[in-house]
Each structure stands twice: as structure tokens, then as C-alpha cells.
Amino acid sequence: EGEKHVGNVEVKAQYGKGKSVNLVVNGAAXPQEYDLDIKANAPQAENLKKLDLSLKTKNPSPDTYVVLVAIDADGRVYKSQSTVVYSEANPLIDVSYTAPNTPTSRLYVKGVKLSENQAKVEVKIVNIRDLSLDAVSEATLQKDNIILKVVANSEKLGLKNYKVDVATKDANNNGKRLEFQATNDNKNVLSGSTTFISKQENKKTIIEGSGTLKVKEEQKSANFKYIRTILTEGNEQGVETFLNLAVGESSYVAESRITNLEYKNSYVYCEEKKQCAHVELNSKVNIQKPGVVQHTVNVNFDLVKLGISPEFGLQITNEISEKKLPQYTLDLHAIKNDKKYHLNIYSHPELGKFPAGITVTLPHRVLALETRVEYPTNKGLPFPIKGEITIHPDKRKAQYKTAARFLVDVTGSDKQHALIADFGFSHPKLGKEALFKVRGNLKNSDNIIEIATSASVSCHPIFGADRESKFVLQVSPSSFKLLLDTPIVKVIELEGTAVVKENLQQGDLKFCLLQGKPVAVRALIKDYQYYEFTTDESDRKLSVIGHLDPEKRVDISADLVLSGEKKNIAHGALFLKDNLVKSEYGASKDNFDYFVTALKNDLTNLEARVKQLGEEINSDFKDILKRAQPKIQELEKAYKEDLEKIYQEVANDETLKNSQVINEVAQFLAKIIDDIVHAFKPLVDKVYNVIVETTKKIEEIYEKEIAPQIKSLYETVASIVKEFFDGLLDIVAHYAALITDFYEKHKPELEELTNTITEIFKDLTRIIVIQLKELKATVGQALEAIITTIKETQNSVVTALQAKYEELGVPESVLNAILEAHNAIRALLPTEETKNFADAVYTYVSKKLRSEKFDEQAQLRVVYEKFTVALQSLIQFLRGQFNQFGIPSLFNIESIPFITGPGQLSYTPTGVGASLSLVNQILRGDIPDPLSLIQAYRPRSLDPFDEIPAKLRGVVVNGQHIFTFDGRHLTFPGNCRYVLAHDYVDRNFTLVLQLQNGKPKSLILEDKSGTTVELKNNGQVAVNGASHGYPVEEKDVYAFRRPDGVLGIGSQYGALAYCSAKLEVCYFEINGFYLGKLRGLLGDGNNEAYDDFRLPNGKISTSESEFGNSYRLASSCPQAKCPEHSHHQQHAALPPACEQVFGGTSTLRPLSLVLDVAPFRQACIHAVAGNAENALREACSLGAGYVALGLGTLLPAVLPPACVRCTDAGGSKNIGDTYEVKLPNKQADILVVIETTKSNEKKDKDLVVPLVSQVVDTTRNLVVPWNLKSKHIAGIKVYLIGVTSRFPYPIVYDTDLKLKSAKVAFNDEHRYQYTPTIKTNCEKADSIQKTIANVIDEIRIVLGLSNINAGYLSAFETPLRPGALKHVITVNGDACKLEIGTPLQAISNIITYNQLGITHSLVASIPGLEVDGKSAPNVIGYTNDYALEFDGKKHAKEVQGAKVTLTEDNYCAELTEVTDGLVLSATNYNALGAGERKQFLLAAANAITQRILQESIVEECVCNYANPFVGRSAC
């Protein structure tokens, strides 16, 4: 409502039976007035049915503050009205209080400044603790003259026509004395005189004196001292006074301080024995440092001496800072009869810490609610995060507190990542904190990967001992470790190592299953001649050892070692003896049977271990059920007792009862607490009873049904495992028989070998083949037997499992238990919809358990539909339950400042409320608008870290339409140099725009060292005022031109600008580091639009003209006047030109859904007003600025077709127009793309520059002079572009037709960018780094993900003219490597070059060039059709059909050849003498010119978008 902001909240709740509570909060805020009304109704409440609270604050004038507080409790109205006037001439304090059963109380203090040294004060106290006072005082205070007159009346204080006259009189000794005269009811109270001494010390006036006064009928000594100080230094201006008066044993001290920052009055009256009465009021504003304002209010009353109690004190402290959250502290205390009551509320958020709490101190206990959240601010990530909430029934007894805490910490580096999470809950009845811990660790260092996780529960003995689970996995090239530990049993512990060397291969494995006996296994190979396999347990060892030395011995032996004694199971050997081959083998059936028996015993033990675990789990679960029931009852009883004690203390406190208002509120609060306890009690009792009954039923079902089934399951699994391994042992025995049979069967052949040893070398191969054939058959039979045995064993195992499963089934008793549990849960559910959902789930589960056939998808669909309905009903139910106890689901009340004293800090309410959480929003039904979420949280960069913090973006169109970083629009037709953006904190950069008659003339960037780079509206660039070609690379600033003609300027400190060639549109992008640190026409960049028009001095201006002119860099420039802006213009009807660009049918319409278009519409209305001739051009320029802003944040956008033309084919073509272009004609475009490697510097100077000159200029000494100028090609353009490995975009150089003016810097070491490594001085680590880096680099190169490739792609976007002959010369540095896209690129290039009539050539170093298999140092260049080489007389000739090969791969050369390009050898050129080089250049230029002029084509072209801003012919 204009400048007034209104907000309201209404909460309705029901509790108990038919009881309701209604709470309505209305708030309104205007610049000088704030209203807050709170209305609460509880019709069924016993003590208080209606409570209305009204708070109104006004600031009718700069020095006047009015506060009205009214409370209506069931028709009993309590009202307080305060008026404070901070005025040097007429200060005023008027506070009145009205209650139903007592007369109105009032404190009235008014001052009148009659002259510079004369003032009058009127004081009225009406019915304050039965005290009334009416007093008027008038004083004249001069250096040598004091007059004080007081008239007062007060029945309570015994004052009747009480008069005081104090005046200075001349003394006999030419001095002055101060005479006192005070009467009460015409009786002498005080009379006499004192000396009078007055002096002036700078700005202090000091008056003091002493003497004897007659008090009633008694003479008493007296002295006084008065000091008056004028405060003029610093920011504080005002007056401070001090008066100390002592008469006999009594004294009176008064202090006063009235300034623009502080108001203070303090009065102390003391009688003998130091019995004092004290009153103090202090309101102070303290500005500790710029941007930090602290406001403190102190009120203290101690009037016990005057018969008024209790002692009362209040202190409120507020602190507001630009860089910190608001700080708030409230302390309220009252003391009576040695009983202390204290309320402390505090909220002290800091960066990284958020402490807050409430403490209530009563005579017998200290209640406290404290919260604290902490996180570090000196790290990249905000971890660890710690939080705690604590409730103290009595803070003096810390052991009785209830607390919940959490800790989350995430740490990481290149080699290690760790996660720690702790969640704890403590209560006195638990005795020990219930703590749930989670630990996770991932290490990756020195070729070792380690994953370690653990979860533990540490809690009350109700759950037995602390429970912990662990999982550890460690892998490296030479080791492996696995650990899985559960609270019941350590499932597996496995550890293995491996050693692989040239003459040694060894593997060790140690494992322990289900906490059984550890087993060690080793496999060893030495010199590929010694083989060993051993298993080692605590009581036995199995060893299998073999030797393989074909020239001496081949053997194998299996032994069992028991108590150090070796027992052979089987052995076999072939060896040479006396030049004869001997054999030896044997087996021990007893030892083998012993081995098999031992294995069977191990299986039996494993079976028993599995059964034992089943028993342990069974027993543990039953113990937990038995202990849970009494503990739940104990906790419930403890909470009930605590609440009851608190209620009784609050309700029965006698001191609180003496204050009618406090007593009413306390009773109301106590009643609410009592109602909540009693309303929740039936629900708690019901839940408790259900838990108890369900626990009993679960225990009963577990004992009778589930436990026997689990026991049977463990026994079944154990027996099946044993049966399976028994089958494996049978297989092993079968293999042993096969092996024995093999040796028996081939014994004659082995004996025959002994007789034929002399022919061993001739027949060895034949024998081996025979043995292998027979071995193959034997192995085949063995494999068949293995497969058959496994199948039979598997089938038997599966059959046994199926039989056991069918036998087990699902007992009816279990189904009945599930039904009872379902009925118990259903009884607890609060709504009919949730009960229907429970029924649907039970129906589905029971059908699955009974193996009934049904449509499962349809049933699940029913469950889902009922779930959604149940969820909605549950949300509504919870909202109702919360509301009935005054717990709102959303707190969205605008803050209303409370007037507490001078120097009030006003603010502009934003009108934006924030819900506490997404859950609250859902409960409230306030689902965020998806479009708003997209606008707020959409990605704005391909690199998410590039937007941390978010960048600042702005646009300037035609120099005068300025769109700030925070989205405001300013039309400023200036005629001077103006600051666009300036880092006023660190002064890292300044952006300046020079305007001439409202049009842009230049854009200037200055770095912190004073270096300036200037973009001019003619496309040129200057450095420190001197002309300079593109690119510009200074220490901290740079400038460039892109192939498409866009100009750029930037700073290494985070400022970047892109402009069109004539500066019509400039897009600015500033790093988010400068949030709130900028000044200039683009705003302060703090994400707050309202303060964008901030002047250099920090003041916020409401005048656009004042704002714009304040950033002139020369005061002599004329002041510009801005056109009037109004809000309705942003949504007004658009002129026709603006409708074409920003209307509903424009291509920019989709962009307006995400990016606010209103400021650009407003700017368009201004731009086309009175400018019909250029209206569309002005509108299109603004459209281009809007598109630039969208593209800068990843939003797709394109200018409307009405704004885009093609002008590169002669004339102006509309988007979509088609036309023909014939070649050749009188134009030629030559594009030279050179790689900026150091190896190309000499090549560029000696070969490329003269070559291009020869192509362009006249060529002599040739029989047929082929060149462009000789063929009357006059319209020649030469483009020079560099590509580099340093960044993925090209460098456009300013150059002439002969490349002689270009300033190319050859700084690259290599053609490709390579991954850097860190030298660790550890040879192994450095080697691993290098290997990984090489792999990454090769992958990047093969995939074409190099900066060189990206630079080439952008370079080929250079706008070559469709009607010109086109030739591309690429200059390679290093040899090109193979990429996956090379064949596709070749095909694409062939199509493109043929369609556009582009010819191309490559200049590259090509060592090892051969023609027809012979070295060819005379070759100038070659194509896929011929080789160009020198003849015997050093004349160039074409050798058709010559086959050119390269001894070193260069895929760029191959690609050029395949696409019908010309490859020129820089290697052969460098080997020539000066005269031969000249012939080389003439021949190469002739070849290039012939290829350019040989094209004769007719192109079909269409005008299309080249980018969102520009049209270009596509032919």
C-alpha cells in the first residue's frame, strides 16, 4: 500500500475435547509508524479467555518518539503510553500506565530552555506505588550567578507547598556566597549559605562551595559541586552535567547527559548508614567502527529506601553490522526480599558461530534452553559442523540436563578423504549418553586404496554392551585386506600379500571365518623351477611342493605336517640318473584319510559355530525386549515430574502474585503447559500401552514361533554347507584315483625312455606330443567327471533347499502374529485414510506370504494411490495438532523495529518472508513456483565452481542505456568520461566509459598500477594513450579481437567486457569476489537492487540524474539530464519497433520467462521516442544487449529476424533469402593460421611472410607469372590468426597484406598442452605420476580434446566473403598426432572446401620425405596428384603420379593430402641456400596462386544466422 507494508498471520488450534485457541497477528510498517496487534482467544480456558496485545510506535518528527502498549485480558485493560522528545530546547518524557483496579499512573518530565543559561523543568508523578509528586523548578546558571527555585507537593513524601530558593548574593569581602532557603508547609527545612567559587576550564563550567546550613532546627555542614560540560568533539554533540550535594550525613548526586547519541539521567539519594535510593535511565548509540552500530538501553530502579519494592533492572542491547548478523541481548531482573528473578534472552550470531538461548532464574531453580551451531570459516569447506540443543530444568545441576548434539566432519585431500558423524542424546535417566557414530575413510596414496567404515551405538545398558560394525577394504598392487565385523560376530578377516619379481613370485593369504581358527595359505614360485603351495593352521600344515627342471628333475610332493612331523600323502618324480631317466611316485592312503577326516572335523566345527551364532542372536534379542519396557516407562515418568515441578513453582510464587500483570501472564503460560501435558497424556498413555502390549506379543511370538524357525534355518544351512563340502572331498578323492591311474598307465612308456636316452633330442618332441594327446583325453575325462559331480552336488543342494523351504513354509501362527501387529498399528493411526493405506499394505504382504496368485502391479498401484491420500490426510492432521498448542507451521512475521531511544536505526522492509524449511512449506501448502526456482537456481556456467561466488553481470547499450549488476535500468545521455565500475576497496581495476552526445566513444580499463587499455568506437585499441594493434597483453590487463569481430578487454583481477565493433553493445562480467565492493554507473553489485544508485560518498540517491552525474571524471563537463522513469512503463504498451523485438511473437519471448525483460522494454520506450527513423535500429541494439545478458548465463537466445541482415555478399539480405554467387571474381581472402610454438618463429620469418608476399605481389622470373595482382584480383584481404596450447581460443592479429606489421609472440614449448607433475624426489612416486600424466595426455590428444583443436575450430569461424576466392594456409610447429576424429574431419573438410570453393595448403617440417621410396631433398611440396620439385637446373617442375611417403608420421600432412591440399616442406626449405630459397618461394607461390584461381563455381547461398547477433551467407 504505497510506502506502507502490511503483514498478518492467523493460527487456529484445537486441544482436548471441544477446546480451541485462536491467534491473530497483524503488522504494519511505514517510514514513521509501526503497528503490531496480537489477539489471542481461548474461550474454554479457565483463567484467561481473551488476550489482546497492541503495540504502536510513531516518529511524527525527527526528535519525537511515541510508543503505545495496550493489553486487554478478558476486558481488563492495561495501557502504557510513552512520549519522548529529544530536543535541546523542549525535551519531554511522558509515560502513563493504566490498569483496571488502580488509578492511572504517570511520569511526566518536561524541560523548557528559556535562554542560553536559563531553563525550566516540570515534573509530575501520579500514583506510582502510591507516590504522587508535582514539582516545578526554574534555574539560571551563569558563571557568577545561580538562581534555583523549586516548588513541590507530595502527600506520600510529606511535601506541602515545599519551596526551595537558591541564589548567589554579594559577600562583605567583595566575594559571593550561595544562600539556601527551603520551607515545607511554611516551616523551615533548610536555610543558610555556603561559599561560592566559579571557574571555567575550556568547555567546563565548575561551581563549588561549602558552609553551614540549618536543617530544621539543627546546624549541619554542607558542600556542593556542580560541573557543566559542553560536548562538541567527535560525532557526539550535547551537554553533560554533574551535581553532588552533601548536607550532614545525607548526600544527593544527579548526573545528566543529553547528546545526539545518548540520553542519560541518574539520581542517587543516600542517608546515614549508606542507605541509598537509586534511579537511572540510559539510552545510548555506540558506533564502534564504520558499519557497526550498537544500541543499548538501561533502566534501573532501587527505591527500597523510599518504601518502594522490588528492585528492578532492564538492559537491552542491539548490534547491527554490515558484515555480521544482528546481535541481540535482553536482561531483565527483579529482587525482593533477597529473592532474585532474572530473564536473559540472547542471540549472538557470528561468522562460524550461532549461539542463542533463554535463561529464567527463579529462587529455587534456573531454567534454560540453549542452542549452538559452529563451523570453521578458515577452510574451503564448512566442516566440522557442530550443533547442540540443551534443556536445563535446573542449570545449577548440570547432571539433570537433557541434550541432543551432532557433529559432522568431512576432510579431504588428494590422498585421503574422511567422514565423521556423531549423533548424541542424553537424559539423567539414561545415565549415559546415547551416541551413534559413523566413521568413513578413503585413502589413495602410494598405489594403495583403502576404504574403512564403521558405525557404533553407545548407549544405556538397555541394549547391552556398546555395538559396533566395521568394514575395511585395502587394496594395493602387492597387498589386499578385507574385514567385516558385526555387533554379533566378526564375519570375515582376510589379509593377503603378493611379491612379483623376476625370479620370485609369492602370494600369502591369511583368513579367519566367523571367529574360527585362522588359516594361512602360501603360493611360491622361484626361478620358475620351484613351486610351493602350503596351508598352515594352528595344529597342522598341508604342503604341496614341486620342482620343474627338465634337464635334471621334475617332481611334486604333497605332505601333511603334524606337530613338526612330516607325513607324505602323495609324491611323484621324473629325474636323470646315470644318463638314464628314472621315475618315482607313491601315495599313503592312511595319511590321505587322515587329511580328509581333519577337513570333515573342520566342517563339523563350522556347522556348530553357525548354530551357536543363531543361539546368541536369539538370546540377545530377547534380552533387549525384556529391558526396553521398564526404561520407556521410567523416561515418561521423569518428563512428567519435571513439567509438574516447573508448573507448581511458577503458579505458586508469592512474589509473582504481587504483580497483577505478571501473575496473569504467568498463570496463562502455566495453564498452557498444564493443558499440553494433560492433552498429550491420553495419546502418550495409548502409545505406551501399545508398545508394552506389542512387546509382549512379539516376545511371545518370537519364543513360540520365530525362534524355533530361526534355529531350524541355521541347522539347515549348516547341514547343507557340510553336505556340499563332503561332496567336494569326494571329488578330491576321485581326482587322486585318476592321477594314480595316470602314472600306472604310462609307466611302460616312461621305462622305454630309459632305453632310448641316446635319441632323446630327436624323439623328445614326439614323446611330448603323445603324452599331451593322452593327457588331453585324460583331462577331458576328468573335467567331465568334475562337471557331472558338481551338477549332481548342485542339484542335490538345490533340491534339499527347496524341500526345506517347502517344509518350513510360513506358519499360520506367524501370519496371525502379523495380523495382530497390523491391528495394533491400525489402532494408532489418526485418520481413516492412513488406516486404509495400512489395510492395503497388509493385504499385499499377506498374499505374498501365502503365495497366492494375483495381479501384483495392480495391487501395488492401489497401495501407491492410498499412500498419496494417506500422506495428505496425515499432513493436515499434524498441522491441526501443532496449531492447537500454539505451534505454528510457519513463522513469517515482518520484523517491527522497537523504539528504544535516540539515534533510531530505520530500515526499509523488504516484504519477503522465509519459511523455516521445505517441510514447513509443504505443511502449509506453499509449494514454490517452479519458474521462480528455475530463475533463482539455474546454472549460469558450465563450470559450477566458476560461479562461487556468483558473478556480476551488466550491459550498456548505445552508451546511454545502462543495466546494472542488480537488474536496474538507467537512461543517461552523458557527454563526458564516467566511471562504470570501480573496486573502491582494493582498487584493483576501474572501468570508464567515454560518451559524446550520449553515444559511446571509447571504453577504458585501468589496472591498479595505472596502465590503461582503451577500446575505441572505430575498432582500434590504445595502450596508455598510444595506438597499439591486437592483441594487447600487459601485466594485469589485456585486449583482444575474436574472429567474428567482437572486441574484448579484461583484467587478471576478475573484470571482463565484450563489445561490438562500434561499442553499440557492451557486456560486462565481474568476479563475485567484488560483491558489494563496487561503485559506478553499473551499481554496487550487492544483489540488492534498491541501493544501486549509490553515490561515491555512500549515500543512496533517488535521482537518476544526480546518480549519473556524480560519476563524472571532470567537473567541467555539462550535467546530463535523465528522462523520467516510472514503474508502469515496464509493462506499458510497446511502440511498433519495440513490439517487433520484445513482443509476444518475438524470438526473445521464451527468454523473458527466465530473464526479466521489463527494464529492456522500458529502455526501448525511451530509445524510440521521437526517433522514428532509427526506431528499429535502437530497439534491435537493446535486444542485442538482452541476448548478451542471456547468453552470458547459459540461456539460449537469438535476435529476431527483423534485426539481422547478411551484408557479406553485396547488398543487404534478409534471413532466409537465397541467391547465387559466381567465382572467381575480383576478390580474394587469405586466412593464415599459425601455431605459436617456438619452432615456428623462424619458419614464420623466413618462409611464411615472404611466401604470402609473393602470393599477393607480382611474381617475376617465371615463364607463366601466376599471382593475384597480376590476375587483376584487387580486393584482397589477409587474416592472420594464431592458435596456442595455452588456451582454447585463437589470437587475432592486426596485420597488413604481407604480414609484416603483425606482432606474433612465439612462446609455446609444444603443440599440445601436457599435464604437469609435482617433483617429490621419490623416484617411484615421480615415475607413477609421469605414467598417469602420459596416459591422460594421450587420451586427450586421441579424443581431440586439445586447446590447439579448439583454436582451429574457432579460427575457421572467420567471416570470409562468399564472393571472394578463399585460401587457407596453416603453419604447423610440431608433428600432429593421430586423433579419433581425423577420418571424419577429412570427410567434413572435403565437403566444406568443395562447397565453398576453398583451397588450402600446409607449411610444416617434414623430415624423412621420400618420393618413390627414395630420399627427396629437392621436393618443394606435394599433393595427392603430383610432387613439385627442382630439376637439375633448379627449375620447379611437377612430377605427376609421384608416390610421396613420410618416414615419420604427421597426420596434419596426411589430412591435407587427402583433402586435395598442398603440403610445403619447411625442412627442405631450411636446407637450401639463399638463391635456391628464392626459387622455392616463387614456385610455392605459383602453385598456391594456380590452386586459388583454378576454382570456377556457382554457389547457391542462403542468408542465415552465423551467431545469435549476426547473419552470414551459407553457401
From Swiss-Prot:
**Superkingdom of this protein's organism:** Eukaryota
Q: Name one GO biological process term.
A: lipid transport
Q: Where in the cell is it found?
A: Secreted
Q: Which GO terms describe its molecular function?
A: lipid binding
Keyword Disulfide bond included in the entry's annotation: yes
The VWFD domain is annotated at: 952-1118
What does UniProt note about where in the body, tissue by tissue, this protein is expressed? Answer: Hemolymph.
Q: Name one GO cellular component term.
A: extracellular region
Q: Does the keyword Coiled coil apply?
A: yes
Q: Which cysteines are joined by disulfide bonds?
A: 976-1117
Keywords assigned = Coiled coil, Disulfide bond, Glycoprotein, Lipid transport, Lipid-binding, Secreted, Transport
| PROSITE patterns noted in UniProt | VWFD (PS51233)
Where are glycans found on this sequence? 988
Q: Which InterPro entries match?
A: ARM-type_fold, VWF_type-D
So what does this one do? Answer: Mediates transport for various types of lipids in hemolymph. Acts by forming lipoprotein particles that bind lipoproteins and lipids. Binds the A.niger cell wall component alpha-1,3-glucan, a fungal pathogen-associated molecular pattern (PAMP) that activates the host immune response.
Protein name as it appears in the record: Apolipophorin
> What is the species listed in this Swiss-Prot or TrEMBL entry?
Galleria mellonella (Greater wax moth)
